[in-house]
Amino acid sequence: MVWVRDLVKVHRTGATATSAIHHVDLEVRRGEFVAVSGPSGAGKSTLLHLLGGLDRPDGGQIWLDGRRVDGLSEARWAMLRRRSIGVVFQFFNLISNMTVADNVELPALLVGVPPRQARARREELLAELGLESKARSTPAELSGGEQQRVALARALVNDPDLLLADEPTGNLDSRNTRDVLRLLSRVHEQGRTILLVTHDARVASAADRVISLFDGAIAGDTEVSLPASRRGSVADVLQLKD
């Protein structure tokens, strides 16, 4: 599903160059749930942005579903994200003058999903995330945690083959974290591929694998040892309390 070789990204500020991603090799199999962990500044968000076409690499190759994509135009990347890749941004990126309902439905409408079908899918996702009463609210009327859940619903509305999520539980309390991870668990069980950035070891333990980044390089790649039956129940894995 995801195949990366010798990936390099350098951030430049004036005459200063900082290696954000340093010759990374990575393979994520179709249907895997992979967590990416590491300290702040390790390159986690940069890696996700590169895999989603939101930033350009300075070297290496990115292949998605057997197709090389690192050289795609912005327009082709945008189409790929609409149809096949869901992205949950760390800072939400919701459209401020649109309601929650419109924010979630928009990606579906852009790829030609009939309005009635887009609305039904939106209602399903908002209900799963405890947001059905917020459908007519604007982002400014929501808490940070509510905005985060809306961003997740928007990323999932087109049932993407690949979900890239940057700290999707970062602003959530235990109850809402559990709701989000239950939804991610269901998405995973449907065969979707998930790559999730997190600082939380409990959240990472819900994944099949945990990749550790340090100074832009992979410092570890570990299979989660919990039995599949326990990984399938996020509430059990994380033992989250209300």
Question: Which residues are covered by each model-predicted region?
Answer:
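Conserved beta-strand-loop-alpha-helix hinge in the C-terminal portion
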Residues: 217-242
